């Protein structure tokens, strides 16, 4: 309803005299009987309009004159609407000249919250220039405020103030104050409160308390106290309700010291603390971890003859958990009973939640069953931690059964509970089960939200199932569930990953069209798509649009564009973007530098590649497996740079960077291709100032007649094992065996020592070297002596003991014991 509409409705001359119409119509016994008979006729007679005309034909009083009393007595709003329509059409002139009758009808509509009808009636009254009472408009304001219609409530309030130069009645104003505070519009609430104080006696204690509570909830406790002093005087707090509000405000701020001062003050002034007072203080001390103080207050509650609330005890148990105290669940239940309280659902929820966090799922289930046996009805907070715990341990069958059990026990799973299970299924890759769970959710009357759709679409996109993801997006729109920014970003990225950039562009355009706040993530996804499609000009244009929209390009933005130019072999532009990135104070990351290193390597400019590698280290950036693999792959392609490839292989071991299969194969391929001549220089200590373990082993094996490939393979394993990466060494060996490469004595020696390095020597029994024989073991011992020059004495002793025991037992079938 617009202010223009309201401005056409005129007030009665005396707004505060809400019953002034009765002055010209005394409520005589005859009037009372007419009103009662009319209400009865309206309720019981089909042809009530004709009957009323007949009844009032011979009466001195017109029906319109008693209609305000009739509307006040009617309890059925439908009858009231019919009566209003009849009066508006059949007795229009008489009816609309009586503002009291229209006002009473408006009060009836407000009482039953018939807002559409209220709007229509106010529209009609505007056209008829009808006078309305202050009381009726106060009722309308109260109805709007209690229903949460803030804009309408404020509109009515402003109209009343403008029209009557007074605020609506105190009940209506208090409802508006409550709504403003709830909506966190404290400034507007304070304005209304001040007008209530300035314009007559339209403020009561509840009005002040509403605003003070709002101030305290927002952390403005001192402002709240000044508000109290402004009304009752300095240092004066009128009653226990205000004390409780102030104490609650301090506790919420974590200012337990001031809260306790106010608590002592109220007792000194003769006020009796209530259970709420004690509960707030106990909770405050619990949050601080001061359980001595909370126990002292608990004793005071008992001394004063107040009944201890289980809420107090629950807070103490929960706080002890949060502060790291060891709490026995069974003892906690006994403690509550000893305090003449019964454990409630909240008690069990606290215990179940904590047990699940401690990994004691089965014990938690026992407490859930115990709660049910005691007649308590578990809720979503009872089941959600259990479902989450079982999902975390990948026991999805049990999690699903718990969901069914919830329904059987009369607890309807909410969107959060379903979301936990769906998230667990998605993370574990059980996408079909996750989608089916969404279907069950809908079948049980729970509507999925944007977060659940986002989870499902993200999981589908990651597993390459883009069509189902697109169908889910369409379903979302069909169900009028507005996709949020994350949903759009997930779908855009999914289509780009699948190579369907056209579809990604459509989704991006749709997000803009729907008014979604497109952020850096969305633009980065599009930039990735442009770069993958070789559309680098469009990628730059997208980054420029980000600047125009006041979005700051991040490391991903620049790194993606740099990588795009590197792949186009346009290093000049890639470096230009890199410098622009630095100029805009966006620090390059490992991905950025790795892209540049790759670009230089592709051009054969290994000098610049190595300088870039050094620069990233000087900036405290740690090269990752992709960085090292990029260098090793390129350097291993040429005989002249193969030695440097070995250097970076050993450097990544030294820096605790675990190589992957690609790194391993790239290095070996360098040796496979070099079938003649020296592939590595003799170790002379000039390799960047370090001796090369790889080179030492490689040349030793070559001199013993091993092939380049076998020597390189074993040398790589030796490096891994010496640096404690025996698990990776075993994985590479398994893959080589599957390719037909048989294990040899040197591999055995390397991996045996590797297990000893990590303190797991017993694992050598699982190694597949059963056919080494006596000669093979002798070879293993010989190479172990070389290997032991690079290992600490305890490792040497342990490995040597195992090897010599194996040699001694070589001619028997007696098993060798681990030392």
UniProtKB/Swiss-Prot annotation:
PROSITE patterns per the UniProt record, alphabetical: PPR
Alphabetized GO MF terms: sequence-specific mRNA binding
Ranges for the PPR repeats: 98-132, 133-163, 169-203, 204-238, 239-273, 274-308, 309-343, 344-378, 379-413, 414-448, 449-483, 484-518, 519-553, 554-588, 589-623, 624-659, 709-743, 744-779
Any one GO BP annotation for this protein: mitochondrial RNA processing
Superkingdom per UniProt: Eukaryota
InterPro entries named among the record's database cross-references: Pentatricopeptide_rpt, TPR-like_helical_dom_sf
Parts forming coiled coils: none
Entry keyword set: Repeat
Xref: Pfam families: PPR_1, PPR_2, PPR_3
A single Gene Ontology CC term: mitochondrion
UniProt record similarity statement: Belongs to the PPR family. P subfamily.
The protein's name: Pentatricopeptide repeat-containing protein At1g52620
Organism: Arabidopsis thaliana
